[in-house]
A protein has these predicted regions:
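Short arginine-rich
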Residues: 225-235
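A short glycine-threonine-serine/GTX helix/turn-capping micro-motif
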Residues: 65-71, 184-193
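Predominantly a Rossmann-like dinucleotide-binding segment in NAD(P)-dependent oxidoreductases
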Residues: 12-13, 20-101, 236
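Aromatic/hydrophobic pocket-lining residues that form π-stacking "cages" and hydrophobic walls in ligand
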Residues: 1-3, 29, 228-229
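Rossmann-fold NAD(P)-binding glycine/threonine-rich loop
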Residues: 1-13
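Short catalytic-loop micro-motif centered on adjacent basic/acidic residues
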Residues: 14-18, 120-122
């Protein structure tokens, strides 16, 4: 909040690299929800599971402020959820240190409540055979997507963001809907991931004064939920989410914490084109 105030005071542009908004699988999920094909969404699970059984010598795995899996990946999964559904009513978080020698959390499981809807955010470092990245169940069907976004690995391997294949995830999702003739499965091709979009929008914001790609108030909202989650884990209970409650949490949070857009209403009208799909018989 101090940074936001400072940026406003000096008429500067401030944003945060929430790059997971431009993951191929998340862009595809957003468009699928907007299409209304799943109907009223009752259950969404967002997993970021990997197999990293050994603790590495790097700051994010040490007992220092801001370390741990909840800060590392929870921030992205929370931001994606807020982009889809807005602020939840309640939040419950479970944290664990599962690996031998772990100094901070390497497992989290969060439950966000939106009325009857439940959103599960989960990440672990001990999953050799990962399940789905996204699982969604609605009144008209279900959707399941395997595999993590490819852009990070492409960048590590030296692939240029200007390459035609950059951001292309060849693993389609599976949409299952129920018709009068029974279940119908469709293979849903992914939209193209595009981390460059953040930087292009940031350039426009600096040069032309257009909105930044990730608004400061959205960043503050994610941080408030991170802090609320840590309190939930410490107290072992579900906590309500609200402006007054979140203000209290942020004010009470120590300066060095120990290691450890608009809401999308469902159902939705049409908004943009539906991801390409191929029926499966």
């Amino acid at each position: 909040r101090s940074l936001v105030s400072l940026a406003q005071e000096h008429d500067l542009q401030l944003s945060v690299f929430h790059n997971r908004r431009w993951d191929a699988d998340f862009l595809t999920l957003q468009q699928l929800l907007h299409s209304g094909e799943l109907g009223e969404v009752y259950h969404l699970e967002s997993h970021f599971d990997r197999f990293r059984p050994e603790v590495r010598d790097r700051w994010r795995e040490q007992a220092v402020p801001g370390s741990g899996l909840w800060y590392d990946l929870g921030a992205h999964l929370l931001d994606q959820t807020l982009q889809l559904f807005g602020q939840p009513e309640t939040l419950w978080l479970d944290l664990a240190q599962q690996r031998p020698g772990a100094k901070t959390d390497d497992f989290f499981h969060a439950v966000l409540q939106y009325g009857a809807r439940r959103v599960i955010l989960h990440a672990s470092t001990q999953v050799a055979a990962p399940g789905a990245r996204f699982t969604v169940h609605g009144s008209l069907g279900s959707y399941r997507k395997q595999g993590l976004d490819v852009q990070e690995e492409q960048l590590k391997s030296g692939t240029s963001p200007l390459d035609a294949q950059f951001g292309c995830d060849p693993r389609p999702g599976l949409l299952t809907t129920v018709t009068a003739q029974g279940p119908r499965e469709q293979s849903i091709a992914n939209l193209t991931g595009n981390y460059r979009a953040f930087y292009l929008q940031m350039v426009e914001a600096i040069q032309r004064g257009t909105p930044v790609p990730v608004k400061p108030d959205e960043v503050v909202g994610v941080m408030e939920l991170i802090e609320l989650g840590l309190r939930s884990a410490r107290e072992g209970r579900r906590l309500p989410v609200g402006a007054q409650h979140l203000d209290s949490v942020v004010q009470q949070a120590p300066s060095s914490s120990p290691a450890h857009t608009a809401p999308l209403a469902m159902p939705l009208g049409q908004s943009g084109s539906t991801p390409r799909s191929t029926p499966r018989h």
